[in-house]
Amino acid sequence: GIVFNGSPLFTGDSGSGESEIRKWIIENDWLESVVSLPDQLFFNTGISTYIWVVTNKKTPQRKGKVQLIDGSSFYKSMKKSLGSKRKFIDDSQREQLLQIYQNFEDNEHSKIFDNEFFGYTKVTIEQPKVENGEVVRDKKGNPKPDSKLRDSERVPLSEDIEQYFSREVEPHLPNSWIDFNKSKVGYEINFTKYFYQYKPLRSSDDISQELLELKKESENLLNLIMD
């Protein structure tokens, strides 16, 4: 395994060096697992880190798959900090993480995805250039693109690009088209997104009640000071 910070998971657009490295590793089916570790594990930095498990000898059940493991909650607090290091992973927690890895199952701490789940095609959306109310055309009669209106979309590799365009883009930009010559495939792993758990917002009544209670506490403290 290799320990990285979060940047190599997602930094760089399609076609960039970072994305091309991810693409190379994933399309060759070498990425077996990514394990998120707790923050504040290291002496010189408090940032979160990730272990990339890379191999060219995947077992049959792991072929074409990537296992993500959220190990961010597996830690004990140190009695005394050492620089930025305030947490450690004890033996029992290491065993738990190893067991999660070996079980290769979807659960609270483990998510399993097909390789292509992390890939997308960045497509360029063009719109016609208009001058004096008329669409400007080239010698073949095709509309010329307006670079000022140029946009892009990320289409998951699991989706058909034409169908995505018809569903998501064309209804809003009926005169637009895709310039397939500019399409590029990229890969990213948005780790926290896959383990996100929605927490309902507190109601306004609860917040108002808490503010009233805090106000009363403040008034009582002020009265004690004045007395």
Predicted regions and their residues:
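A conserved structural/catalytic subdomain of Rossmann-like adenosyl-cofactor enzymes
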Residues: 2-223
